[in-house]
């Protein structure tokens, strides 16, 4: 599986204390994404400028002369950089690092079981997130089976924009689906993410039906609330109306934040400035809307 991070002691990706495995690659293009390194799935060069000690090793090493000094600061010409990663091998300060790495199921298992005791005492487990982990369905199925056989609680965080056959492969090994819904309006969804939400909504309905008729998993819906995108009472009311007819165990609202801006800079990208954090009172308003539809928050 191609991943870009393993985060321990997470308390935001399902119940209890969890280990979150972040897969690389996503088939949506949400402009507010706080994990830009997860999107392309291709290898990238990350530059942590605050860790650079200006030793100059990368200046001498780079055949394309992508590294240089400007005003006493280390700069990277991304237009000529070929992401060969030779510079990362000589950067002992770890200012230059590759984004992705390939890990097999055995390596993932070894990393995950390190925190098994925390899982047992907190009701936690492992969450596969991203990116979109279901784009690597064969690898995901393999590691889910391993975790399930060890009695580790398993969760998959997905945007749902995949063929339902992928869900069918992992349903027997998944205890919880964290299912992202951005909008109900199809045209708005395509504008914000680059894709229609028709498949996403249809897959959620299918998961709901399986859950209701004996599926041995929980279904949580997570809604990013983004000012300048979907933070609209009318849109949230439509989502609530849609979810009210489904077998949803819980709904969570994730207010947009700007903590990912530094990641964009480290990749040589510019974060969009059109998105805003919604005020707390707006979150309370939509909680009331969902509450009136008897959706558990």
Question: What does each of the following model-derived ranges do?
Answer:
Residues 31-38, 57-76, 86-101:
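Iron-sulfur cluster-binding cysteine motifs and their immediate structural context
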Residues 97, 190-196, 267-276:
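Short glycine-enriched, charge-decorated loop/helix-capping segments at active-site entrances
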Residues 4-57, 74-83:
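N-terminal pre-triad scaffold of radical SAM enzymes
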Residues 94, 149-150, 293:
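Conserved dinucleotide-binding and phosphotransfer motif residues
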Residues 2-4, 70, 157-161:
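Short gly/ser/thr-rich secondary-structure transition/capping motifs
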Residues 106-260:
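Conserved AdoMet/S-adenosylmethionine-binding subsite of the radical SAM
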Residues 2-15, 212-216, 225-297:
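Auxiliary Fe-S-binding modules of radical SAM enzymes
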Residues 14-15, 22, 40, 44-45, ...:
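N-terminal-biased segments
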């Amino acid at each position: 599986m191609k991943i870009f991070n393993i985060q321990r002691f997470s308390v935001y990706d399902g119940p209890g204390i969890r280990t979150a495995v972040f897969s690389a690659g996503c088939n949506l293009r949400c402009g507010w994404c706080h994990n830009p390194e997860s999107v392309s799935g291709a290898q990238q060069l990350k530059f942590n400028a605050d860790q650079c000690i200006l030793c100059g090793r990368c200046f001498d090493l780079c055949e394309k002369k992508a590294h240089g000094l400007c005003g006493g600061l280390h700069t990277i010409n991304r237009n000529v950089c070929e992401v060969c990663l030779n510079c990362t091998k000589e950067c002992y300060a770890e200012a230059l690092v590759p984004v992705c790495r390939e890990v097999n199921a055995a390596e993932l298992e070894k990393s995950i079981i390190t925190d098994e005791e925390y899982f047992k005492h907190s009701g936690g487990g492992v969450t596969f997130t991203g990116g979109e982990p279901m784009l690597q369905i064969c690898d995901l199925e393999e590691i889910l089976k391993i975790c399930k056989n060890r009695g580790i609680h398993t969760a998959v965080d997905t945007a749902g924009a995949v063929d339902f056959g992928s869900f069918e492969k992992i349903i027997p090994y998944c205890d919880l689906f964290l299912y992202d819904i951005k909008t109900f309006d199809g045209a708005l969804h395509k504008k914000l993410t680059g894709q229609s939400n028709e498949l996403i909504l249809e897959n959620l309905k299918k998961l709901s039906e399986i859950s209701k008729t004996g599926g041995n998993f929980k279904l949580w819906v997570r809604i990013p609330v983004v000012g300048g995108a979907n933070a609209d009472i009318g849109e949230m009311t439509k989502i609530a109306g849609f979810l009210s007819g489904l077998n949803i165990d819980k709904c969570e609202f994730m207010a947009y934040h700007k903590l990912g801006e530094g990641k964009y800079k480290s990749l040589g990208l510019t974060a969009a400035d059109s998105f805003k954090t919604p005020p707390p009172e707006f979150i309370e308003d939509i909680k009331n809307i969902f509450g009136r539809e008897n959706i558990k928050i």
